Amino acid sequence: MTTYFKLVKGATKIKSAPPKQKYLDPILLGTSNEEDFYEIVKGLDSRINDTAWTIVYKSLLVVHLMIREGSKDVALRYYSRNLEFFDIENIRGSNGSASGDMRALDRYDNYLKVRCREFGKIKKDYVRDGYRTLKLNSGNYGSSRNKQHSINIALDHVESLEVQIQALIKNKYTQYDLSNELIIFGFKLLIQDLLALYNALNEGIITLLESFFELSHHNAERTLDLYKTFVDLTEHVVRYLKSGKTAGLKIPVIKHITTKLVRSLEEHLIEDDKTHNTFVPVDSSQGSAGAVVAKSTAQERLEQIREQKRILEAQLKNEQVAISPALTTVTAAQSYNPFGTDSSMHTNIPMAVANQTQQIANNPFVSQTQPQVMNTPTAHTEPANLNVPEYAAVQHTVNFNPVQDAGVSAQQTGYYSINNHLTPTFTGAGFGGYSVSQDTTAASNQQVSHSQTGSNNPFALHNAATIATGNPAHENVLNNPFSRPNFDEQNTNMPLQQQIISNPFQNQTYNQQQFQQQKMPLSSINSVMTTPTSMQGSMNIPQRFDKMEFQAHYTQNHLQQQQQQQQQQQQQQQQQPQQGYYVPATAGANPVTNITGTVQPQNFPFYPQQQPQPEQSQTQQPVLGNQYANNLNLIDM
């Protein structure tokens, strides 16, 4: 057993899968050598006579690939002289021809047989040579004798192309047939052959129609018959290619000459049957005059056909240009938009932030209407022309993009950009709170002022609030977290929407978070008041704190609490039992400079050394109650 016979056997295994490339490549290379080619042919002869459907079908696939990709015209020349290779009688006798697989095998075998037979007639493979060879055969006529010979060759080649296409389009498959991998592999090869053959046929028809009025009457009738067949084949080819698209194959759009010349050509032939002036050689003067008239009419029709050819060639060259104007129009429409945004200014900003900033900053009507945040999930607004409290128009925005480029500053587009009387001033407290200007009560009946979008500096808001008050001491009041003269009044008249901002655990906008991160120390963020762990179960007090109540009571009762805590700690050291609990830290001498000493709890339990007396355990509970009675002021009930 030779090497090529083994390769053929491996390429035509009974397995229902396309031939592997490791077998096909050596076989295709072997077609360039005559001895190797004959060994391949012997191996295929033994496999084509097998009774297994997969082996026979894969043998035909190998022959098809040798015709398409092997040495040029080697396989076609051999099988055109040995058409008996395609007589697959053994498998027909064993399996019959009723099944769908057998019908597909017969149609595929017949197409390859027709392909080889037509090559024996015209000695031309238009799948590999292309349609340009057909154009050259009829282009340069030379003498009239050569002209007629070239036209006859063109007629023969066009007729052969139509026969091959008719045999090819008979290989129709259903969706069930295309589920077979072998049939899909062969179907792809058929589609590629059909595109090449149809392009060659289209060029041949154009060549014949250009010379239609210069042909003999017999050749003109033959050309008309070929043109009618071409019109019918065009419809079938289009349907066949559509079936390839449904199978998931990439099918290009085919271009062909018009199919509406049948009637005009028939009328011309009928007229010539009556006059006998169009295709008859002219010898007399009378005939010459009649020929001039007839020639002028024929020339007009010839020019029409040539115009059809020029249109077709323009369509083939400008196939992609037909799609590009739509894209150019869309690009031109998008190049200038007076109401759009400038993309060059926001190349490094995320889409949501850029849209939100540009819709407010570039809108000329934003100063006349209530500002709205387009991309925020929740927004609570009030009309600007109503007499409502100054905090009723608070917008709560949630920014889902906490990361922003360092080179782009954040612009105030929320409520603080249009309300000067409510400024997010940092208080310095451990809860990240913000103070409220004292001039808010005086501006309660004022409407919302124009939006301020000129400044991107978050510190400019603090300066604007300081200048607006006109009081030099007001800046100190804002910077002092313990100076709250009118806090209780403002807190009682404050609506629920504004109190949401006072919640230290409430989500803040990105501008407030950026301002807080620049000025708030890390130690003050982590300082949170907690109750002793031993008292949480009995007191049933929720662990929620309000920074405003803490600051108000702290400024009023701080000194009293300091004295009481010192006395209570002395009593605790004498009367406290062995049970350990956390003791709040003693406040420093200066309540302003030593804030963290009164806010942070001790991190270790306290165990007194003295043993308590049995009779003193009954008096311990009121002492503990007095001890934490004052500390309850620090907890939001």
UniProtKB/Swiss-Prot annotation:
Q: Which Gene3D superfamilies does the record match to this protein?
A: 1.25.40.90, ANTH domain
- The UniProt regions of compositional bias labelled Polar residues, in chain numbering, are 623-637
> Where primarily located?
other
Origin, by domain of life?
Eukaryota
Region (Clathrin-binding) location: 587-637
Q: Where is the composition biased (Low complexity)?
A: 560-579, 600-622
**A GO BP term, please?**
endocytosis
Question: Mind telling me which CDD domains this protein's record contains?
Answer: ANTH_N_YAP180 (cd16988)
Kindly indicate whether the keyword Iron belongs to this entry. Answer: no
What are the recorded GO MF terms, alphabetically?
1-phosphatidylinositol binding; clathrin binding; clathrin heavy chain binding; phosphatidylinositol-4,5-bisphosphate binding; SNARE binding
* Residue ranges, annotated region (Disordered): 555-637
Stated membrane topology is: Peripheral membrane protein
The record's annotation in InterPro entries points to: ANTH_dom, ANTH_dom_sf, AP180-like, ENTH, ENTH_VHS
Q: What keywords does the record list, in alphabetical order? A: Cell membrane, Cytoplasm, Endocytosis, Membrane
Q: Where is each ENTH domain found? A: 1-126
Which Pfam families does the entry link to? ANTH
Compartment(s) where it occurs, according to its Swiss-Prot or TrEMBL record: Bud; Bud neck; Cell membrane; Cytoplasm
Q: Its GO CC terms?
A: cellular bud neck; clathrin-coated pit; clathrin-coated vesicle; plasma membrane; prospore membrane
Coiled coil (UniProt feature): none
Q: Where is the signal peptide?
A: none
> Misc remark for this entry?
Present with 623 molecules/cell in log phase SD medium.
Q: Which family does it belong to?
A: Belongs to the AP180 family.
Tell me how this protein assembles: Interacts with PAN1 and the clathrin heavy and light chains CHC1 and CLC1.
UniProt function note: Involved in endocytosis and clathrin cage assembly.
What protein does this entry describe? Clathrin coat assembly protein AP180A
Q: Which organism is it from?
A: Saccharomyces cerevisiae (strain ATCC 204508 / S288c) (Baker's yeast)
The primary gene name is YAP1801
